[in-house]
Amino acid sequence: MFNVESVERVELCESLLTWIQTFNVDAPCQTAEDLTNGVVMSQVLQKIDPVYFDDNWLNRIKTEVGDNWRLKISNLKKILKGILDYNHEILGQQINDFTLPDVNLIGEHSDAAELGRMLQLILGCAVNCEQKQEYIQAIMMMEESVQHVVMTAIQELMSKESPVSAGHDAYVDLDRQLKKTTEELNEALSAKEEIAQRCHELDMQVAALQEEKSSLLAENQILMERLNQSDSIEDPNSPAGRRHLQLQTQLEQLQEETFRLEAAKDDYRIRCEELEKEISELRQQNDELTTLADEAQSLKDEIDVLRHSSDKVSKLEGQVESYKKKLEDLGDLRRQVKLLEEKNTMYMQNTVSLEEELRKANAARGQLETYKRQVVELQNRLSDESKKADKLDFEYKRLKEKVDGLQKEKDRLRTERDSLKETIEELRCVQAQEGQLTTQGLMPLGSQESSDSLAAEIVTPEIREKLIRLQHENKMLKLNQEDSDNEKIALLQSLLDDANLRKNELETENRLVNQRLLEVQSQVEELQKSLQDQGSKAEDSVLLKKKLEEHLEKLHEANNELQKKRAIIEDLEPRFNNSSLRIEELQEALRKKEEEMKQMEERYKKYLEKAKSVIRTLDPKQNQGAAPEIQALKNQLQERDRLFHSLEKEYEKTKSQRDMEEKYIVSAWYNMGMTLHKKAAEDRLASTGSGQSFLARQRQATSTRRSYPGHVQPATAR
């Protein structure tokens, strides 16, 4: 293996500088100092791979650095990092045991040795990229000394490179690689045939030239004999001398052409030998690829088998998950059964308490109806008494007016005040009586004795379920009835209070209007009497007429007010009638609800008696004959237990089978990976042989990188 340490670093730097000049970049690159700022290197890298080293990366390299060595070092660090990342990410290689260039020495002192190492890394990127054939051809066109140094640097760099990773599944690309190799082999064979044809043509040309040469030699000999016989050929003026010069020049031309054809023949022979070697190498590679293809096919079959087994494993896992869900549902059902049993006992206790409350509510409902009737009677009596009181007040005031006419106005105000006070007191009495009635209606009645609890007697689940349903139904009906009764009672109470209040107001206004009307009528009567008594007096007639007109106006105003009050009363009467109709409808609905409650209570009592009779008949001696439903429930529980145990056994079996299949898959995958890794290592060792040419090793390295894109990382790369 070559070692670049035998070559002077200065010579390496100069040779690589000559190679850099072949890229024709914009920046000057005549001396080593021109490369220390990193601008030329960045432009060269962009030409090598413009996709990876794009304009964004190039813009990070500062062009105007001048003599600032810090900016130079910054540019060189960016370039070195880009080269290493390109080798790792794009080329899939990692440089080991290679001394990286010291960018500080390059930037500060323009060190040629470190600059040569940097250019050597750029050279490695060029000969390993996708356009490597161009750059290798450019190297071949350079001088032999420069070419030798560059080739030595390439081989040293290649000896330090190692692939980052090799693929465990390389057999995926073997078919494609085999087709490509077959195409290259066919191209090489066609090129060989063309070269052989060309060699044959050149041999024919050489034979023809040799025959021509022999004929010319014979002719020359004849001419020499003639020359000896004739004049001296040294005289150029003589015809023989001129002919001699002409033949001599023609002979020299033929000799040069012969030498040129022989050199071309040797070159073609060497090229033919190289192509034969390449054909043999390609055949060997073809054989290796066919073996790899067979191995890949066998591995594909194994993978199909493993995939089928993995599908079975996934199905079994799905079944196990469904069994787990069923087991969880079974546990939930058991917990629900326990909760329902607890609720059953609680509902039975609530049933007894609700029966007691129902009895109390029935008793309170009867008392409430009696109180309502008493309230209506008292209101009627109150209205009658108020009318009588109004009449008595009116008579009292009339007599008092006759006695004392001067204090008429004062007495009238006093009577009005007294009447208002009486009305307020009456209203207060009515409100106090109504409040007392409502409080008496809502007072709790005496509690009765609770019925016997049946929690200890209920045994079977069906009886418990029936009782639970009945209790829930009873509870919902009671709640609905209580809510509806409370709402209706509150609504009726509010409507009744509003109606009573409005009625009292209207009665008060009506009473006042009647009093005013009676007063006006009495005044009219008095005026008429006084007019009849004093009809003879002419001077008082005008005054009497005025008084009469005033009293008539007052009477008219009172009649108008009375008509307005009557209209208001007539407007309010339909509302009062509607509210009374609504109250009657609500009372009728309440009565229907009470009848429904009675029916529900009767049904509940029947069900309760039936449950008690069933419980009494459940004697322990007759359980087997009289309780087939209990036996059916027991059978169902036993069947569920058996199903549970069978599911557990099947789950354990599938779990052990899945564990074994996972172990088999892991072992097969490990063996396949080891085989491919060993094969890749042998290929790499075979590709580094010293007997092959540089171009052959380059092709093998490229095919290895394409075939094994990478999962296994060698120990040197770690």
From Swiss-Prot:
The modification N-acetylmethionine is found at residue 1. InterPro entries: CH_dom, CH_dom_sf, Hook_C, HOOK_N. Keywords: Acetylation, Coiled coil, Cytoplasm, Cytoskeleton, Golgi apparatus, Microtubule, Phosphoprotein, Protein transport, Transport. This is Protein Hook homolog 3. Expressed in brain, cerebellum, heart, intestine, kidney, liver, lung, skeletal muscle, spleen and stomach (at protein level). The lineage of its organism: Eukaryota, Metazoa, Chordata, Craniata, Vertebrata. It holds the Pfam family HOOK. It comes from Mus musculus (Mouse). Self-associates. Component of the FTS/Hook/FHIP complex (FHF complex), composed of AKTIP/FTS, FHIP1B, and one or more members of the Hook family of proteins HOOK1, HOOK2, and HOOK3. May interact directly with AKTIP/FTS, HOOK1 and HOOK2. Associates with several subunits of the homotypic vesicular sorting complex (the HOPS complex) including VPS16 and VPS41; these interactions may be indirect. Interacts with IIGP1. Interacts with MSR1, and this association is stimulated by ligand binding to MSR1. Interacts with microtubules. PROSITE patterns: CH. One of its GO terms (molecular function) is dynein intermediate chain binding.
